[in-house]
Amino acid sequence: MLEKLDTLGAYLLAVLMAGTFLYFVIAHQLGFKYAKKLFGTRRIKEQSQVIPLEGNLFAACYVRTNQPRIFDLHIHHELSAAFLYRWYSEGKLKLVQQKPAFETVNYLSIQKDAVIRDQEENSLYQKFCEASGKDGLLEVDEVYHWSYSHPGDLYGFSPEDKGQEWLEDHGMMEPVNPKDKLTNLGARIRPLTPAGAAKARVLVELQNFLQAQAEGKPSGPLDTDWIDDLLCYGQLFGIADKLAEKWRTSLTEEQTIVVGLCRDLALAFFNGNNEATD
């Protein structure tokens, strides 16, 4: 009798293992994967090419840095890189190449009379205008030296506070609760409303899609019609360089150069300030 039960148990175990394997094979073919980055383990569509949070980069920054169980990253320089690439895609920045000797030097020329309606975004834009000097050219070393000579709060405001304000204005945050967890700075981590969480979830879906693209994993076809938007968020996630390498056949040489230049300028912008205030 015990021998029969052992045989039956082994048979059921084999069936269970085979069924589980078959399920994951079918799920993979249907374009699903599992993500643990947000709200626990959840099955999501592999390809998510939807602009999250209406394209508001400050809100995305807040979600990434303040919401529990999402991301725990200090991404201010990545936020600046994302804005730089967005301004380039909007025509406010243009690539300038000069050959003073044997090596081409890349700059970004900045349109100093550009109109940016958002006050905080414009504040950041104006600082890059100042860093560009009289010739209006953003060059890595010059941006670093400008930043070093202007120590202090480079933003002039908190990107996270700006993001929280946007989420509040759009009814996506729960009211203040004394029981909410505290950040390292003592601020309350306010949870998103269910509707807000659903919209914020698109951010991690996009991040998962871009991460899979950067790693060369199956993630569905790439919609090249909005590849500049994808590269903007790639900057925010710190993987734009990897994306540019993987998408090199879909990008112009200029786009590839600008991706790296935006990253380098953003790093120079913050490294100079950090070293001046250390």
Model-derived features: where do they sit?
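Acidic, Ser/Thr/Pro-rich intrinsically disordered cytosolic tails and loops
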Residues: 1-278
